[in-house]
Amino acid sequence: MASFTCSSPSSILPIIDTRSGNLRCTFQSQVSCGIQRDDNGRRVWRRRTLTKKDDMLRYKMQRVPFVEEQVRKIREVGKVMTMDIEQLLLREDNRFEFVNSVAAEATEYVDKNRDEYGGSKKAIFHVLSNRVNDLGFDRPEAYVEADPYKPGPGYLLEYYT
């Protein structure tokens, strides 16, 4: 006896008996997708469940990734210095006089010590950092910082001991 069954909620074709050599087939088609009915009887299509848990939540890291690189980028681009200059200019009544006084002070620094200013340390940055420090904000001298992400001279000693 051979029978083929396909299910459809609404259409059933006639059955042919195979006992006498006739083939018995029942054809039904059933749609098995994510169509559901809500309380009002409307069909709701859901591709996936809406209450999905975060798989990576249990692998929470101790630090925010790439923060060190972002801090380095901000310092290299000079956003901190730009904000400091804007803050100093907003506090001054006469901006042109302020710029001229900063330039004159930077020229004095260069005249006093030409060897110190020329490489990575700039006299104008020294003047601006001094003015911002006078306002109460902590800035390194001439905005020069050693790279905190490069290992120091004792790096190999610490690594192997």
Swiss-Prot record:
Induction text: By light. Induced by cytokinin (e.g. trans-zeatin).
Transit peptide: 1-32
Record bears the keyword Transit peptide: yes
GO biological process: chloroplast organization; plastid transcription; response to cytokinin; response to light stimulus; thylakoid membrane organization
Subcellular localization: Plastid, Chloroplast
Keywords of this entry: Chloroplast, Plastid, Transcription, Transcription regulation, Transit peptide
UniProt GO cellular component terms: chloroplast; chloroplast nucleoid; plastid-encoded plastid RNA polymerase complex
Tissue: Mostly expressed in leaves, flowers and seedlings, and, to a lower extent, in roots and stems.
Effect of a null allele: Albino plants with defective chloroplasts containing a few appressed membranes but lacking thylakoids, even when grown under normal light conditions. Reduced plastid-encoded RNA polymerase (PEP) activity.
InterPro entries: PTAC7
Major place of residence: plastid
Quaternary state and interactors: Component of the transcriptionally active chromosome (TAC) complexes. Interacts with FLN1, PTAC10, PTAC12/HMR/PAP5 and PTAC14. Binds to SL1/MTERF3.
Function: Essential for chloroplast development, especially for thylakoid formation. Involved in plastid gene expression, probably by maintaining plastid-encoded RNA polymerase (PEP) activity.
Annotated protein name in UniProt: Protein PLASTID TRANSCRIPTIONALLY ACTIVE 7
